């Protein structure tokens, strides 16, 4: 509270405003003596509670933690050790006060030293000042006595330069603190407190009673436990108290430098990898304990001498609060380092992990046949993965037990939490019990390996399925194409069959009656079938064909007529086949339009009746006369006795399929002649119809065409040029007179059905005109 009391002291204001921060070694020592006297004078007086210096330093509010009782205020006396803590306040407050201070004053504190221990090194009043931004405690001010030190939580980060000794005396963790203390000791003969153990806090401080109760809490926090307030200064490298003497030797030089703060910034202050090992931690613990004991003893002595227990170190919480933004920035930097370092750190050595677990037993039921394809290529990689999975899990339980504080302060520890992500096998481990019912949790590695193979096999299976689908699609496409081709071929075949049926006058389905073997090579014609000797020929039809020919088909699908003499025929089998096909054969034979193969049918029937195939008879002559064929059949082909027993009467309507007797053949001969004439008549009729149309159109003839009489052309006709309407006639040709146009010519029609004019001179004498009306029955018999 001395700081508040000194608010009315003019000297204090002057000193504050003037800010004599740049003080060399000798000047600083004289200024310190003057301040000590002021502190003693003010310590006896009761200082007012209101903080007069606070607005000067720009501190928005006094430190919550440190409020010394009124009893303690008069008892406190300015002591050089108290000046050291001001250095601590400067260290913590420097970042915030850099803008307000003179460049000289800022020089010493441009860069805050790395993480700083929570515990203040000594009972100095100023170390307790928390530095809110812009709050600057002035050591030269009257407030700087031990009473001010309790107000230290407010302390601005920049103590006056006259107290450079004190600034330097303030310990930075162990190393930096030593440098400050050495500087103050050189400048002042006053004894400096040994550097307090890190994080030690006087139990008498009211606000931080929880920290004062156990200084070891700060020590433990400084070791590696993350600072609750985000101040990473605790985790900074802890330098043993031994180094204080060495740091003191260089402190004088540092204080004289224009920027002592730059020199005082050790790289180790922000935490270094040196503490990553357990051995180093133990050494640091020993050093901290020694410094703590020494510091605690001196604190007790001073308390007894001065009787001002509240003037002890500023409360650690004040430091923690003061170090807010700067400590957070350091935390971020360390966090970045820690986040980046695990990627660079290798896995822990094998000796720390211990021996790997024994290889699990092979599962009782394992079928590796489907994995043989990929087992050779993946055997090495799978072995490595299994080893990593078995060896990596043990470290997490071992490290927390042996090195609990390391994760917060050392970058070497973060790899441990990052290990589980590397061991990404949980989904496979979940599946592994299915294949390994009798295995322990240690066997997950083997299960994982097997599952890798299973995955490979599953992948292959999926690929096979996709390939099979593609194959099926291809097959479907090919099948569709094939079906389309078959349909086209079928259509073409049907179309061809229709043409063949129309061409060869086939009715009904095409059936093979007999298989014949070619006995010679035949070069077919327009409708004849060409084949080679020994080739099999299918007999399609043996009736309704030209004389001496059958309708056959080769293996190539060609249709045509074949001569019966060019193939070898088994008549016995043909007879049986014909009997089976008798029903469909009858309508063909009954068909009156086709009679060309009737003679052949007669010959075949006669040969089959003889029982011995014999030599197939030569085809009959084109000219067939009624009666002659009947006689030949009677003479050359006697009827079998069975047919004779049937009776003497012979009927003309007996079917040829029943192999009639010669009398039936005779009747068939007459039918053949009639059929041919009828066929000719049909052709003539068609031709005549066409000619008649032309005639009516050409001669504009309407009405019924009636033949008046018939006549013949004279044999003495001379050739002449015929007109467009003249009928070309031949000598002796018979004509039918249709109309008598005039005396010179008549309209006639010849046998071919053509019409035209014919001169009367070309016609023979027509005496018959007189007898046109005589009926056939009117025949005069002179006898």
Swiss-Prot record:
Compositional bias segments (type: Pro residues): 345-363, 392-424
Could you tell me which residues belong to the region Disordered? Answer: 1-502, 598-678
**Biased composition, class Polar residues, residue ranges:** 1-18, 25-45, 374-387
Keyword tags:
Acetylation, Cell junction, Coiled coil, Cytoplasm, Disease variant, Nucleus, Phosphoprotein, Repeat, SH3 domain
Residues annotated as coiled-coil are 456-507
Subcellular location, record wording: Cytoplasm; Nucleus; Cell junction
The protein here is known as FYN-binding protein 1
Annotated organism of origin: Homo sapiens (Human)
**Source organism lineage?**
Eukaryota, Metazoa, Chordata, Craniata, Vertebrata
């Amino acid at each position: 509270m001395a700081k508040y009391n000194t608010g009315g002291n003019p000297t204090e204001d002057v000193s504050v405003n003037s800010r004599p921060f740049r003080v060399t070694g000798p000047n600083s020592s004289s200024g310190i003596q003057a301040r000590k006297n002021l502190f003693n004078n003010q310590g006896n007086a009761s200082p007012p509670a209101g903080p007069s210096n606070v607005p000067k330093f720009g501190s928005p509010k006094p430190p919550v933690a440190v409020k010394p009782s009124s009893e303690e205020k008069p008892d406190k006396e300015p002591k050089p050790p108290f000046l050291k803590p001001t250095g601590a306040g400067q260290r913590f407050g420097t970042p915030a006060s850099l803008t307000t201070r003179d460049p000289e004053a800022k020089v010493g504190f441009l860069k805050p030293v790395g993480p700083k221990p929570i515990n203040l090194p000594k009972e100095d009043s100023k170390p307790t000042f928390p530095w809110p931004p812009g709050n600057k405690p002035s050591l030269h001010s009257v407030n700087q006595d031990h009473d001010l030190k309790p107000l230290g939580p407010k302390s601005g980060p920049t103590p006056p330069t006259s107290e450079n000794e004190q600034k330097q005396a303030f310990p930075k963790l162990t190393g930096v603190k030593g440098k400050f203390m050495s500087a103050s000791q050189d400048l002042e003969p006053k004894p400096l407190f040994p550097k307090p153990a890190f994080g030690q806090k006087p139990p008498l401080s009211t606000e931080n009673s929880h920290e004062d109760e156990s200084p070891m809490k700060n020590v433990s926090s400084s070791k590696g436990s993350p600072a609750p307030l985000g101040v990473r200064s605790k985790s900074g490298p802890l330098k043993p108290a031994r180094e204080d003497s060495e740091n003191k030797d260089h402190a004088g030089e540092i204080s004289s430098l224009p920027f002592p703060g730059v020199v005082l910034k050790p790289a180790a202050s922000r935490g270094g990898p040196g503490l990553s090992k357990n051995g180093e931690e133990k050494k640091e613990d020993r050093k901290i304990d020694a410094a703590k004991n020494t510091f605690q003893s001196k604190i007790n002595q001073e308390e007894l001498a001065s009787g001002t227990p509240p003037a002890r170190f500023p409360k650690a919480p004040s430091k923690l609060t003061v170090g807010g933004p700067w400590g957070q920035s350091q935390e971020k930097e360390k966090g970045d380092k820690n986040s980046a370092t695990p990627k660079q750190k290798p896995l822990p050595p094998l000796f720390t992990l211990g021996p790997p677990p024994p290889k699990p037993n092979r599962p009782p039921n394992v079928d590796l046949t489907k994995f043989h394809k990929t087992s050779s290529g993946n055997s090495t990689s799978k072995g490595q993965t299994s080893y990593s999975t078995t060896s990596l899990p043990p470290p997490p339980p071992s490290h927390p037990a042996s090195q609990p504080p390391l994760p917060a302060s050392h970058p070497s520890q973060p790899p441990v939490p990052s290990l589980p992500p590397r061991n990404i096998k949980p989904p496979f481990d979940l599946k592994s019990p299915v294949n390994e019912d009798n295995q322990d949790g240690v066997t997950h590695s083997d299960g994982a390996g097997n599952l890798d193979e299973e995955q490979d096999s599953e992948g292959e299976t999926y690929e096979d399925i996709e390939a099979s689908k593609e194959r099926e699609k291809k097959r479907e496409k090919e099948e569709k194409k094939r079906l389309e081709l078959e349909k086209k071929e079928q259509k073409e075949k049907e179309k061809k069959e229709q043409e063949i049926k129309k061409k060869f006058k086939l009715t009904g389905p095409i059936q093979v009656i007999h298989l014949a073997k070619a006995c010679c090579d035949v070069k077919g014609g327009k409708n004849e079938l060409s084949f080679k000797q020994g080739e099999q020929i299918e007999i399609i039809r043996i009736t309704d064909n030209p004389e001496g020919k059958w309708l056959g088909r080769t293996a190539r699908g060609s249709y045509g007529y074949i001569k019966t003499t060019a193939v070898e025929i088994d008549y016995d089998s043909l007879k049986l086949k014909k009997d089976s096909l008798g029903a469909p054969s009858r309508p063909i034979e009954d068909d009156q339009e086709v009679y060309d193969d009737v003679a052949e049918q007669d010959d075949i029937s006669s040969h089959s009746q003889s029982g011995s195939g014999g030599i197939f008879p030569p085809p009959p002559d084109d000219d067939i006369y009624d009666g002659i064929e009947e006689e030949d059949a009677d003479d050359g082909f006697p009827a079998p006795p069975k047919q004779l027993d049937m009776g003497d009467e012979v009927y003309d309507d007996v079917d040829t399929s029943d192999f009639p007797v010669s009398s039936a053949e005779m009747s068939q001969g007459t039918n053949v002649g009639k059929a041919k004439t009828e066929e000719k008549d049909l052709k003539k009729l068609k031709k005549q119809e066409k000619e008649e149309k032309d005639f009516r159109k050409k001669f504009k003839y309407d009405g019924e065409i009636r033949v008046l009489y018939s006549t013949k052309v004279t044999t003495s006709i001379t050739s002449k040029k015929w007109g467009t309407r003249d009928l070309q006639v031949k000598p002796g040709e018979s004509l039918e007179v249709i109309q008598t146009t005039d005396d010179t010519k008549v309209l006639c029609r010849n046998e071919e059905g053509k019409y035209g004019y014919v001169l009367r001179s070309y016609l023979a004498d027509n005496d018959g005109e007189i007898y046109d009306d005589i009926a056939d029955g009117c025949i005069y018999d002179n006898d």
